[in-house]
Amino acid sequence: MGKKSEKKVVEETMEVDEQPAVEPEAVPEEEPEVEDEDLNVPKKKKMEILDPKSFEQDPSNLTLILYEEDHTIGNSIKHILSRMDEVEFCGYNVPHPLEDKILFRVQTKDGINALEVLVKAFESVEQVFSTIRGKFEAAYEKSIA
């Protein structure tokens, strides 16, 4: 490196070093949390039926996307559905680990609405999770008493 190049690097470094430090009072305070409703931001979809026309023609076959969900709910729902007599097939897939969604497929016996069966499965999972939460909270209260 020549002397001119070295001098230029030193001058650039000095400019950066000579900038005044930020005072703690100058740091802006955190913004208060604002609800989406206040901003008129459209709410994100939680669920989407992939082919609504196909589902209307045959309500025993349902393929949908669950947004903001992962293996926790996917495997729980699949487990409950697989034990139901009305269900012929159920499965889920996480398309990509960085995407926050799962694809879910339910096929029921003829004449049985797959969406209604899926709702029953969600209610069962909700009941299981609330039971687990109740037992956990009781054990926690017992341990700190």
Swiss-Prot record:
Region annotation (Disordered) ranges: 1-52
One GO molecular-function annotation for this sequence? protein dimerization activity
Q: Which InterPro entries match?
A: RBP11-like, RBP11-like_dimer, RNA_pol_Rpb11_13-16kDa_CS, RNAP_AC19, Rpo11-like
One Gene Ontology cellular component term attached to this UniProt record is:
RNA polymerase I complex
* Main location (coarse class): nucleus
Compartmental location: Nucleus
What this chain does, per the record? DNA-dependent RNA polymerase catalyzes the transcription of DNA into RNA using the four ribonucleoside triphosphates as substrates. Common core component of RNA polymerases I and III which synthesize ribosomal RNA precursors and small RNAs, such as 5S rRNA and tRNAs, respectively.
How it assembles, according to the record, is: Component of the RNA polymerase I (Pol I) and RNA polymerase III (Pol III) complexes consisting of at least 13 and 17 subunits, respectively.
Family the UniProt entry places it in: Belongs to the archaeal Rpo11/eukaryotic RPB11/RPC19 RNA polymerase subunit family.
**Protein known as:** Probable DNA-directed RNA polymerases I and III subunit RPAC2
Organism the protein comes from: Caenorhabditis briggsae
State the encoding gene: rpac-19
